[in-house]
């Protein structure tokens, strides 16, 4: 068969205007994103640094919005210059927002208020208030006072866009108690809510008397994950815990009595009492031992990734079947590299069941498949590898002995040698189906970085974008690629934060040539 020609962007736009893709909304959306991907990756397209700003407080990014001053000020990243969407009133240090999640309206749901159909920011303040804020105006739409018996600090999705978990800081006890060798029985609390409108699932305490040498706990997809100092990780059904150990059902806005005090649930100063207290160790759904409690689940069918619980095994990853703990064929992955920084591995966020393994000079995309003639066993194989652009060179060290003899020694450089191109960040842009890879090279005194876009299916390099600012490898960096936007957030010493915004533009040089030709 002959090679299939791809329709160019102009032809696809013309066909869309004539209604060729109008049979369902999904087709139109995919067509639009296909057109945008073609524009992003074409050779003439450039990404220009349109503005840069600096701040003394952390900078956050969520879906086209940049947040400054602990989420108090919101700026659009779409405009070619900073355009303020809103600024909330100044507040005291105790009222500042410490963590936030962006909530977006579910498709097809009937909601109680017109404002509910617009995006909201779910925010946690330093003084334990949970807020729902309009992402458009900054207006506070809902507020809940959590409690005074602990300090809540972290927000995460249990079920994305449906259920949130609010996690407290760990209770270390007083300095005097620590010196005496005693510690409080409750390590931390987890408050769980359904969103829009807020409704309480429950507040759970993680008690050392039940979980013994517990070091941390979190909630994800209805699973309570408990980590222990021995490296053990145990998974429990959160729903089963709620059904067995909930002491009383609490509803926000309703009267409640607790410990001789009466108040309204979710209002200050009463807050929300802890109403889920585990008294006996529940049966775990699953348990495994892993170095530093590192544990991930993913793939089709379900597999998990761990590092054997021995220090000398650091950098060795085992991929095992969840159903019977059997090691996949070729399931031991170890990147042969000599570097100061560890390589890392995770399940691909594109829901393909693949695995991404990142080292200083290579990005391996691995696939999980059935073993031929044995459907009960699965194997790991390479799908593709992205290599850093490097010279194969060795350092010659010359030593002169006491007798005057010259001795040459060849010493191989580290794989994350700063003078060689090194991978620092790997991410996935789901709408355009592109892998984005940040590579950094130290040139003289400063580092230079570029962001590369690779085909998610084959790993082919489609586009490379140089970042104009220098890249110091000792600083903390975040890079976001969102449709036609690239955002680089950098944290420098002394809590100085910088934000560099790049937008997709046509090459001005090519525009001038086109004008000259037309004249």
UniProtKB/Swiss-Prot annotation:
Pathway: Protein modification; protein ubiquitination. It is found in: Membrane; Nucleus, Nucleolus. One of its GO terms (biological process) is acrosome assembly. Keywords: Membrane, Nucleus, Transmembrane, Transmembrane helix, Ubl conjugation pathway. Disulfide bonds: none annotated. It is a multi-pass membrane protein. One of its GO terms (cellular component) is Cul4-RING E3 ubiquitin ligase complex. Its main location: membrane. The chain crosses the membrane at residues 186-206, 222-242. Ubiquitously expressed in the embryo, with higher expression in brain, liver and skin tissues. Interacts with DDB1, CUL4A and CUL4B. May function as a substrate receptor for CUL4-DDB1 E3 ubiquitin-protein ligase complex. This is DDB1- and CUL4-associated factor 17. It comes from Mus musculus. The lineage of its organism: Eukaryota, Metazoa, Chordata, Craniata, Vertebrata.
């Amino acid at each position: 068969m002959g090679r299939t020609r791809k329709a160019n962007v102009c032809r696809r736009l013309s066909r869309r205007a004539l209604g060729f893709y109008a049979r369902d909304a999904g087709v139109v959306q995919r067509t639009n994103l296909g057109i945008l991907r073609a524009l992003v990756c074409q050779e003439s397209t450039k990404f220009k640094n349109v503005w840069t700003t600096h701040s003394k407080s952390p900078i956050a990014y969520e879906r086209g919005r940049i947040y400054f001053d602990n989420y108090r000020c919101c700026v659009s990243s779409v405009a070619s210059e900073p355009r303020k969407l809103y600024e909330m009133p100044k507040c005291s240090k105790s009222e500042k927002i410490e963590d936030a999640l962006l909530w977006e309206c579910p498709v097809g749901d009937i909601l109680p208020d017109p404002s509910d159909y617009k995006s909201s920011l779910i925010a946690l303040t330093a003084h334990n208030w949970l807020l729902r804020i309009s992402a458009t105006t900054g207006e506070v739409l809902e507020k809940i006072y959590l409690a005074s018996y602990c300090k809540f600090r972290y927000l995460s999705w249990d079920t994305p866009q449906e259920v949130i978990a609010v996690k407290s800081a760990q209770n270390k006890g007083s300095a005097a108690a620590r010196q005496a060798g005693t510690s409080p029985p409750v390590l931390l609390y987890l408050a769980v809510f359904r969103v829009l409108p807020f409704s309480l699932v429950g507040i759970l305490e993680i008690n050392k008397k039940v979980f013994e040498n517990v070091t941390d706990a979190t909630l994800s997809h209805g699973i309570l994950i408990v980590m222990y100092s021995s490296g053990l990780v145990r998974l429990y059904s959160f729903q089963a815990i709620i059904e067995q150990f909930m002491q009383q059902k609490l509803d926000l806005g309703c009267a409640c009595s607790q410990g001789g005090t009466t108040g309204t649930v979710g209002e200050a100063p009463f807050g929300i009492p802890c109403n889920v207290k585990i008294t006996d160790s529940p049966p775990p759904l699953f348990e495994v031992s892993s170095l530093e409690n590192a544990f991930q689940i993913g793939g089709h069918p379900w597999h998990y990734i761990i590092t054997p619980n021995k220090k000398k095994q650091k950098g060795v990853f085992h991929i095992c079947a969840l159903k019977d703990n059997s090691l996949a064929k070729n399931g031991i992955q170890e990147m042969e590299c000599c570097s100061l920084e560890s390589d890392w591995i995770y399940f691909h966020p594109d829901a393909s069941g693949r695995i991404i393994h990142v080292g200083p000079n290579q990005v391996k995309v691995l696939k999980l498949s059935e073993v031929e003639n044995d459907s009960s066993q699965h194997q790991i194989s390479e799908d593709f590898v992205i290599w850093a652009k490097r010279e194969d060179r060795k350092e010659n060290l010359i030593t002169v002995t006491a007798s005057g003899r010259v001795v040459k020694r060849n010493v191989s450089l580290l794989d994350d040698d700063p003078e060689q191109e090194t991978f620092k960040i790997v991410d996935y842009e789901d709408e355009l189906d592109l892998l984005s890879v940040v590579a950094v090279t130290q040139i003289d005194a400063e580092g230079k970085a570029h962001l590369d876009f690779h085909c998610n299916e084959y790993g082919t390099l489609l586009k490379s974008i140089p970042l104009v600012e220098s890249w110091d490898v000792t600083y903390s960096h975040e890079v976001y690629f969102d449709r036609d936007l690239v955002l680089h957030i950098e944290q420098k010493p002394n809590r100085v934060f910088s934000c560099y915004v790049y937008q997709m533009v046509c090459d001005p040089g090519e525009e001038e040539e086109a004008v000259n030709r037309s004249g």
